[in-house]
Swiss-Prot record:
Keywords: Chaperone, Cytoplasm, DNA replication, Metal-binding, Repeat, Stress response, Zinc, Zinc-finger. Binds 2 Zn(2+) ions per monomer. GO terms for cellular component: cytoplasm. HAMAP family: DnaJ. This is Chaperone protein DnaJ. The J domain is necessary and sufficient to stimulate DnaK ATPase activity. Zinc center 1 plays an important role in the autonomous, DnaK-independent chaperone activity of DnaJ. Zinc center 2 is essential for interaction with DnaK and for DnaJ activity. InterPro entries: DnaJ (IPR012724), DnaJ_C (IPR002939), DnaJ_domain (IPR001623), DnaJ_domain_CS (IPR018253), HSP40/DnaJ_pept-bd (IPR008971), HSP_DnaJ_Cys-rich_dom (IPR001305), HSP_DnaJ_Cys-rich_dom_sf (IPR036410), J_dom_sf (IPR036869). Belongs to the DnaJ family. One of its GO terms (molecular function) is heat shock protein binding. Homodimer. It is found in: Cytoplasm.
């Protein structure tokens, strides 16, 4: 028995909208549901409604159905020609590629020059090395054309032969059964792996692969200011091309070791500076380490813990050359764990006084400095 038109099943016209299809499906599914309907053929009608909705609610399936009818309703062409699909999921993509792809379109020459592959190499730098940059000589494993056979893969004194199975084209014709009849598809020749050539006597060095694995030394310039996770592109130092094609690029990925004192935030450097209570309360001038050398920093009296000071131009250079970052110094008060009796008495005196005069500050400063 031939299938009814899906639009007819749902009681719709071909121009029905998505909302109209949904409404029709809900109404008919409820009407013919086996648990509700008393009609004799309710199960068959319910299945028919489900099948129609499955196709018409999917834009791709609906387009195929509108063009090809029931033959194109499902991707696998299930049910066409008395049952079964063609090759377990042979769909429209396969058919159209057969018509317009491998056999009918422009075919690439299997022996044409092809570019090689990109390579990646990881390096680890110290914090200061990333700030100031450096030159590295790295040794990377690469596949280069075989020197013995000059990249041909054939034993010296011999040459490749034209594949007899594909007549040097690199492709063979394969017949396939489709819903539209028998078609001829073109695919890569299995005897020559799509190259169109056979190596009778292989090179003893590369065993016919035309390439050999070796380690190559490459000079890499690490720019100043590079940050963790960034990469450097070294043009033309990737894997060699095929059939005389150009080499691709080498990408050097940089990892930066953590520093015991400094942290990096973009072009800026952050550090924490421990100070005593007396230094914070009374003020002081301290030496602060930077990657460019020590600099003096004036701490105003009454500075609170967590206060941030900026040292302009003492950060990392921008890796693209756009100026220089700054260094930010965050001061933290260090509470002593061991106090002398004199220091304890002074702190109790300080805590008990409502007005803090200069004489008490002087005593505190001398006590904490051990004077």
């Amino acid at each position: 028995m031939s299938k009814r038109d899906y639009y007819e099943v749902l009681g719709l016209s071909k121009g029905a909208s998505t909302d109209e299809i949904k409404k029709a499906y809900r109404r008919l599914a409820k009407k013919y549901h086996p648990d509700v309907s008393k009609e004799e053929n309710a199960i068959e009608k319910f299945k028919e409604v489900q099948e129609a909705y499955e196709v018409l609610s999917d834009d791709q399936k609906r387009a195929q159905y509108d063009q090809f009818g029931h033959a194109g309703a499902n991707q696998g062409f299930g049910g066409f020609g008395g049952g079964g699909d063609f090759g377990g999921g042979f769909g429209f993509e396969d058919i159209f590629s057969s018509f317009f792809g491998g056999g009918g379109g422009r075919r690439r020459d299997p022996n044409a020059p092809r570019q090689g592959a990109d390579l990646q190499y990881q390096v680890t730098l110290d914090f200061e090395e990333a700030i100031f940059g450096k030159e590295l000589n790295v040794e990377i494993p690469v596949e280069d054309p075989c020197d013995t056979c000059k990249g041909s893969g054939a034993k010296p004194g011999t040459s490749k032969e034209t594949c007899k199975h594909c007549s040097g084209s690199g492709q063979v014709s394969v017949e396939q059964n489709t819903p539209f009849g028998r078609i001829v598809n073109r695919q890569a020749c299995g005897h020559c792996s799509g190259t169109g050539q056979i190596i009778k006597e292989k090179c003893t060095t590369c065993h016919g692969s035309s390439k050999v694995r070796k380690r190559k030394k490459i000079n890499v310039k690490i720019p100043a200011g590079i940050d963790n996770g960034q990469q450097i592109r070294v043009s033309g130092k990737g894997e060699a091309g095929v059939n005389g094609g150009p080499a691709r690029d080498l990408y050097v990925v940089v990892h930066v070791r953590n520093h015991e004192f400094f942290e990096r935030e973009g072009d800026h450097i952050i550090c924490e500076m421990p100070l005593t209570f007396a230094q914070m309360a009374l003020g002081d001038e301290v030496e602060v380490p930077t990657v460019h050398g020590k600099v003096k920093l004036k701490i105003p009296a009454g500075t609170q813990t967590g206060t941030e000071f900026r040292l302009k131009g003492k950060g990392a250079p921008n890796v693209r050359g756009y100026g220089q970052g700054d260094q930010y110094v965050v001061v933290r008060v260090v509470v002593p764990t061991k106090l002398t009796s004199q220091q304890k008495d002074l702190l109790r005196e300080f805590a008990g006084q409502e007005e803090q005069d200069d004489s008490l500050f002087g005593k505190l400063k001398r006590a904490f400095k051990g004077e």
